[in-house]
């Protein structure tokens, strides 16, 4: 093999290593942190308290709502925007769902579509303000956040709504085979669907293009405003999924759900 061929081969290996580092270093670092915290927790609390499947089930249960909402936020951020109202959107849609099902006696099958309708309406307002009016995402979603919070507090009078119907409680406290939380399964399914859409569809690639350079995407024939608008709709849908798992996970609807 000639020296030139060897140099090309070495360069290609270096490129592969560099690409691997670029693509996977954040994931490797995250896994490393998980291992470190697991070891520290094991040393501090012992195996009987931390390294148990019961504890991992509880972690999955508690993290599912945040994980579902984070998916929608990530999709918006791919376009270069963000939405700080998603947590309060979860708050409002869960409170509305609780009132419809518990106070008004509406069947779960009828209440859930109305929850999605409310969430999509809020997402549409955010998307319209940011994409078509040109309001900065921070200003637009900050205002929407406080509107959602105020409406949720108004309609619930800051009082929890306990004892949700069993059908909706199954989403937040139900388990497959008594071991795997339903809400965690929903979260994983949503992530898989999002990965497939973003990787293998034209719309997904266009979302990345908009985030990379909105001007270049515009001159390439991509409707930048509509794609940004659409990501806010998708985020509102994931937030409503999160509210569906949040309502029964606490067995009540609370306007104080502001930590998201």
Regions found by a protein language model. Name each.
Residues 133, 137-200, 227-230, 250-258:
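Transmembrane helix-bundle core of multi-pass membrane transporters
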Residues 105-145:
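Alpha-helical transmembrane segments within multi-pass membrane transporters and channels
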């Amino acid at each position: 093999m000639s020296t030139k061929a060897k140099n090309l081969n070495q360069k290609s290996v270096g490129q592969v290593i560099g690409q691997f580092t670029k693509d996977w270093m954040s994931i490797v670092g995250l896994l490393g942190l998980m291992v470190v915290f697991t070891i520290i927790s094991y040393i501090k609390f012992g195996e009987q308290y931390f390294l148990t499947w019961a504890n991992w089930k509880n972690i999955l249960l508690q993290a599912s709502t945040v994980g579902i909402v984070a998916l929608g936020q990530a999709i918006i951020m791919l376009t270069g925007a963000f939405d700080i109202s998603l947590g309060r959107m979860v708050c409002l849609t869960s409170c509305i769902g609780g009132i419809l099902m518990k106070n008004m006696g509406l069947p779960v099958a009828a209440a859930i579509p109305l929850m999605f309708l409310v969430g999509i309406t809020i997402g549409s307002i955010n998307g319209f303000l940011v994409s078509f009016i040109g309001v900065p995402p921070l200003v637009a979603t900050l205002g929407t956040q406080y509107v959602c919070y105020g409406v949720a507090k108004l309609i619930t009078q800051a009082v929890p709504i306990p004892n949700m119907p069993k059908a909706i409680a199954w989403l937040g406290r139900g388990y497959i085979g008594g071991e795997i939380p339903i809400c965690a399964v929903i979260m994983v399914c949503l992530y898989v669907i999002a990965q497939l859409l973003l990787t293998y569809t034209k719309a997904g690639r266009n979302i990345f293009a908009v985030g990379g350079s909105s001007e270049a995407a515009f001159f390439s024939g991509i409707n930048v405003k509509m794609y940004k608008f659409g990501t806010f709709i998708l985020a509102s849908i994931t937030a409503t999924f999160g509210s569906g798992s949040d309502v029964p996970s606490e067995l009540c609807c609370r306007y104080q759900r502001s930590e998201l």
